């Protein structure tokens, strides 16, 4: 394995009723709070009233930023930065899923940055400080509640990029599975695809001697595969929501990537697709990932065969290693389809008309990917296979 240094300062507060911990945690950082949330689901399920009541109890002065988009936009980040500066915000509280948290990270950094936030999002500048923030998670998917990463879309230029900084870890994150029980089936499935994709990005590498990392990844995948079909048939099952929520956090909080270097090419391609078409991120991943896998298979057939046998229970008897690997990829595709995830870009009405544009967007920073370095022809081939 590779040398590594691990650090994750986020305090994770997990379980039923843990929302009460807001009264303990928020006062550590100040009274002037920016409450960031999305399209209004937290008002429909009662969480908004609960949070506001707790913040009132501790004497917090709350300013609100509602309406964060599913693919959070630079314009919303800038709006939040302006509020922070104008109102003297001391602490931000993100109540929502990964998009709300990602947006909050960019606002927290932007409020302390002398310049356009797009500069650090596109890695042309570095942030050295950020306002403190915490999260209350309502959707198990991205892992943003316990990492420093964020993805922001510039809708005007049709660009979407991931970024991160050591200063953009949440101070704390409250994870009560109860608040995910009203998430509808389609978004539940998107979350499942997203967390599995995060594991795949860290599983596909060429680093030797990573038996524990491999088994940890495989354990998360097996756990999700066992729980997911039950959950989509029983959306209000607390134990299943609990399992999926914890899995999503573990999938991208740094535990699985210690000593390895993941790939992340599929995410980069999907960012280009959803920058142009504004489709759900995980929907794009469900379509692209099996096709990326088939495209890069011959870079390390053994690793794909290992996944097929250990995670998808492919029987290798009498089969070539490559056939085992291919069967594993098709079992993944079939599993996601069985949950109701999309399998073709056509499912979103996407055809060939913008393939070249999406390839150009994906190649904005040059060739990418570590498992196999992808050039423009590779990206186009994966996109065409995904139509």
Swiss-Prot record:
Function comment: Long-chain alkyl alcohol dehydrogenase that can oxidize a broad range of alkyl alcohols from methanol to 1-triacontanol (C1 to C30) as well as 1,3-propanediol and acetaldehyde. Oxidizes isopropyl alcohol, isoamylol, acetone, octanal and decanal. The best substrate is 1-octanol.
One Pfam family this sequence matches: Fe-ADH
Entry's pH dependence statement: Optimum pH is 8.0.
UniProtKB keywords: NAD, Oxidoreductase
Protein name per Swiss-Prot or TrEMBL: Long-chain-alcohol dehydrogenase 2
Thermal dependence of activity, per record: Optimum temperature is 60 degrees Celsius.
Protein source organism: Geobacillus thermodenitrificans (strain NG80-2)
Catalytic activity: a long-chain primary fatty alcohol + 2 NAD(+) + H2O = a long-chain fatty acid + 2 NADH + 3 H(+)
PROSITE patterns xref list: ADH_IRON_1 (PS00913), ADH_IRON_2 (PS00060)
InterPro entries: ADH_Fe/GldA (IPR001670), ADH_Fe_C (IPR056798), ADH_Fe_CS (IPR018211), BDH-like (IPR044731)
Family indicated by similarity: Belongs to the iron-containing alcohol dehydrogenase family.
Enzyme Commission identifier(s): 1.1.1.192
Residues that bind NAD(+): 98-102, 138-141
Disulfide bonds: none
Enzyme's top EC category: oxidoreductase
GO molecular function, one term: metal ion binding
Summary of subunit composition and partner proteins: Homodimer.
GO terms under cellular component: cytosol
């Amino acid at each position: 394995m590779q040398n590594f240094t691990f650090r994750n300062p986020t305090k994770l507060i997990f379980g039923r009723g843990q929302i009460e911990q807001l009264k303990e945690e928020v006062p550590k950082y100040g009274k002037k709070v920016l409450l960031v949330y999305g399209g209004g689901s937290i008002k429909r399920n009662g969480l908004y009233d609960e949070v506001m009541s707790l913040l009132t109890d501790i004497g917090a002065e709350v300013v609100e930023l509602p309406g964060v988009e599913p693919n959070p936009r630079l314009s919303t980040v800038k709006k939040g930065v302006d509020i922070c500066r104008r109102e003297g915000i001391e602490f931000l509280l993100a109540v929502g899923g990964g998009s709300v948290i990602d947006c909050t990270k960019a606002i927290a950094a932007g409020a302390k940055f002398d310049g356009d936030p797009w500069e650090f999002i596109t890695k042309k500048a570095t942030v050295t400080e950020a306002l403190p923030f915490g999260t209350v998670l309502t959707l198990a998917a991205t892992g943003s509640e316990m990492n420093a990463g964020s993805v922001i879309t510039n809708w005007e230029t049709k660009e979407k990029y991931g970024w991160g900084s050591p200063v953009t870890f949440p101070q704390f994150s409250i994870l009560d599975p109860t608040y995910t029980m009203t998430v509808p089936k389609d978004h539940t499935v998107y979350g499942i695809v997203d967390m599995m994709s995060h594991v795949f990005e860290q599983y596909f590498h060429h680093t030797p001697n990573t038996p524990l990392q491999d088994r940890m990844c495989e354990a998360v995948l097996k756990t999700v595969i066992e729980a997911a079909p039950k959950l989509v048939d029983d959306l209000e099952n607390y134990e299943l929501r609990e399992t999926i929520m914890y899995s999503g956090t573990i999938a991208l909080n740094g535990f699985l990537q210690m000593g390895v270097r993941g790939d992340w090419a599929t995410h980069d391609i999907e960012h280009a697709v959803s920058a142009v078409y504004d489709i759900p991120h995980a929907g794009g991943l469900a379509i692209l990932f099996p096709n990326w896998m088939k495209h890069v298979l011959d870079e390390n057939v053994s690793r794909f065969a290992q996944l097929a046998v250990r995670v998808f229970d492919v029987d290798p008897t009498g089969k070539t290693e490559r056939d085992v690997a291919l069967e594993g990829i098709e079992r993944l595709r079939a599993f996601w389809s069985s949950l109701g995830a999309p399998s073709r870009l056509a499912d979103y009405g996407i055809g060939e008309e913008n393939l070249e544009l999406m390839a150009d967007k994906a190649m904005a920073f040059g060739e990418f990917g570590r498992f196999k370095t992808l050039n423009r022809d590779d990206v186009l081939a994966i996109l065409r296979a995904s139509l």
